[in-house]
Amino acid sequence: MDTLTAIGRWLAKQHVVTWCVHHEGELWCANAFYLFDAQNVALYLLTDDKTRHAQMSGACASVAGTVNGQPKTVARIRGVQFKGEIRRLEGQESDAARKAYLRRFPVARGLPAPVWEIRLDEIKFTDNTLGFGKKLHWLRDSRAQQA
């Protein structure tokens, strides 16, 4: 199994992302439920335009963040660190992402918040189930690396 497939399978089983945005010397982090899109290597989430992180992001911004599980033992620790770009989706792109998101999280049907995409450009996946401290790396430009 290649690196991106392994990372993608794990990301598809999780549901909460933390991301941080930087704007005019200020940092802010946020959490949200997400849907992983393996084809585009992206996370889709809903967040209101009035939130601090959305206002700091504007139409598009660089972000860094994490996705991690909550295992009971160190030997089962798995988690992702990433950097990428967040942008607010519009039109058909937004409609398609919202439809997929609502299939995964039907409770969000009444939420009018816009859909945002975090395009993952670099991923470091720590997977202790493969050996303590085992890391898999993926870069959008090179498509896959392993360390």
UniProtKB/Swiss-Prot annotation:
SUPFAM superfamilies in UniProt: FMN-binding split barrel (SSF50475)
Gene that this polypeptide is encoded by: yhbP
Protein name: UPF0306 protein YhbP
The species this protein was found in: Salmonella paratyphi A (strain AKU_12601)
Family matches, as HAMAP family: UPF0306
Domain of life: Bacteria
Xref: InterPro entries: Split_barrel_FMN-bd (IPR012349), UPF0306 (IPR011194)
Family: Belongs to the UPF0306 family.
